[in-house]
């Protein structure tokens, strides 16, 4: 999305712009963790050659697994599992709840990492500059957590990694921020269509094999709700009223009734959704038993691939 499509159309001046340091820190952390993962993986030492040779052998122990094993140019699934990938059996039966958090800091390969971090920079910096690191950090972490819960409920026979849930949470928060702060935007329809298009593209990519679309959906829904809670802004005209020196000027509410309703409904939904999801997960529930067609949301079979 171009920056001009995301610009705020405020009718007053003097908006505070925060310095974005958390988003670059998140990117550095993800890249650093990936380097540690590749060092631990040590393809030349652990690969037997049954699936082919290591890729980029010049990197030695940092070289990638054979493409037949990992087309994203990354480590083996066993290395990811050892270092904190989301694995239903280990989370529920092994009591390793921390995997619901650690999985969002791991990536399947350098392609996966670059794509996610590029989007995190685009969306994260813009949001952090406008709303500060605390609110954006909360949205990122809680959305990633929500994505992990939904993924673990539906994908119980495979492992999952990636910041996609947290990233989609940022996108969802941007969408709800547009809706709840509708009166202070210029080019409302253009911005709305741009958000919906980008989100649709990401969800469509999630229909491909090897991509965890349940993490996408869980993160998106969580972030969408959190946007109504954490990113609510004063309605158009309130700032002018507050700064007005006119005696007897009619009082104006800081937020409009619709914003309060959205705040309350979103708060109930996010608390209830995360609570119910955790209860179902640790009760050993399989989401596919309650939704027979939901597996199609993660991978849609075509003549080009099977699921």
Swiss-Prot record:
The species this protein belongs to is: Arabidopsis thaliana
State the EC number(s). Answer: 3.4.21.105
Keyword field: Hydrolase, Membrane, Mitochondrion, Protease, Serine protease, Transit peptide, Transmembrane, Transmembrane helix
**Transit peptide segment:** 1-62
Q: Does the keyword Protease apply?
A: yes
The way it spans or sits in the membrane comes to:
Multi-pass membrane protein
**TM spans (from-to):** 105-125, 136-156, 159-179, 191-211, 214-234, 262-282
Q: What is this protein called?
A: RHOMBOID-like protein 6, mitochondrial
> What is the annotated localization of this protein?
Mitochondrion membrane
InterPro entries, per this entry?
Answer: Peptidase_S54_rhomboid-like (IPR002610), Peptidase_S54_rhomboid_dom (IPR022764), Rhomboid-like_sf (IPR035952)
- Record-stated family: Belongs to the peptidase S54 family.
């Amino acid at each position: 999305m171009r920056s001009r499509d995301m610009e705020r159309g405020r009718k007053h001046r003097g908006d505070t712009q925060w310095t974005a340091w958390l988003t670059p820190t998140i990117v550095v952390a993800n890249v650093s963790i990936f380097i540690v993962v590749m060092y631990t993986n040590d393809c030349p030492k652990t690969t037997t050659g049954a699936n082919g040779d290591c890729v980029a052998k010049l990197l030695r122990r940092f070289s990638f697994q054979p493409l037949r094993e990992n087309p994203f140019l990354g480590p083996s699934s066993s290395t990811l599992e050892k270092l904190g990938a989301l694995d239903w059996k280990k989370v529920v039966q092994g009591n390793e709840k921390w995997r619901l958090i650690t999985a969002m800091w791991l990536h399947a390969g350098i392609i996966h990492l670059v794509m996610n971090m590029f989007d995190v920079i685009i969306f994260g910096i813009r949001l952090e500059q406008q709303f500060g690191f605390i609110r954006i950090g909360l949205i990122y972490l809680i959305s990633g957590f929500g994505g992990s819960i939904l993924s673990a409920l539906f994908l119980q026979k495979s492992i999952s990694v990636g910041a996609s849930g947290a990233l989609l949470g940022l996108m969802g928060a941007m969408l709800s921020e547009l809706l709840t702060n509708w009166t202070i935007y210029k080019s409302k329809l253009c911005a709305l269509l741009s958000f919906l298009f980008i989100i649709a593209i990401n969800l469509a990519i999630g229909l491909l094999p090897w991509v965890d679309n349940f993490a996408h959906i869980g993160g998106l829904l969580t972030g969408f709700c959190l946007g109504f809670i954490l990113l609510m802004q004063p309605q158009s005209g309130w700032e002018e009223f507050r700064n007005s020196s006119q005696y007897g000027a009619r009082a104006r509410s800081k937020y409009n009734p619709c914003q309060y309703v959205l705040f309350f409904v979103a708060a109930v939904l996010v608390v209830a959704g995360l609570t119910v999801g955790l209860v179902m997960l640790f009760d050993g529930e399989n989401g596919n038993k309650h939704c027979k067609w939901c597996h199609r949301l993660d991978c849609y079979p075509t003549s080009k691939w099977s699921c």
